[in-house]
Amino acid sequence: MRFASLGSGSRGNALLVEAGATRLLLDCGFGPRETVAKLGRLGLAPEDLSGILVTHEHSDHIGGAFKLATRHRLAVWMTHGTFAAAPQGRSGIPRVELIDSQQSFQVGDLEIQPFPVPHDAREPVQFVFSDGRHRLGVVTDLGSSTPHVQRMLTGCDALVLECNHDEDMLQRGNYPPHLKRRIAGRFGHLDNAAAAALLSALDNCKLQHLIAAHLSQQNNTADLARKALAGVLGCAEAWVGVADQDEGFGWRALSLC
């Protein structure tokens, strides 16, 4: 199994997960033309995709999903709540699969386990992917951790973990008070310290890759996110990857130890 990012942040998110002949796009917050260009940088075209998974209905995650699916005849998986809250444009999608937020399902060579998260959307989920040998946990939009989130992510071989903001930078910044409250709230986004606390609650003995994701360009820095997560693992800060808003990150492969 391997994974890569097309970009991560408030202006758009998309993550690729591949196992065997199966390639899934997790979220698509970029327009179709930009998505095609970003896929090309990773050596892929839309025709190589097995489908699109959607975590929730916010535009930075779903904004380009329906157009890409319609143009390239791709299936889309999402929860009932996300489907109900999603913007218009679903009619041309060849196949929409509505998923239970806690029931695993199979797409080709990937087993996918969704799990609910605290976020200000209708029925948001994040996912753990498995190819039968390795597990990749992805959690990029949640305001707080829960025991269930911890159970889902513990023991993963790779993690893509939200480090949205530095609390001091957010409070000193120029966002209006209501937006600061939303971001820092229980149903908003994890700050660096909260992400580190979540990481510290997990069994990380098999961890091969750790990526800090969904960083705010105004209220965080890559160095601060790396420092927070590396402090938990006792590893070099450079070992922690960061998903860039524009470039994402290249392919990361999971290997048998």
Describe each model-derived feature in a short phrase:
Residues P32-M78:
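Active-site metal-binding motif and surrounding structural segment of the metallo-beta-lactamase
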Residues P147-D244:
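Cap/insert and terminal regions of metallo-dependent hydrolase folds
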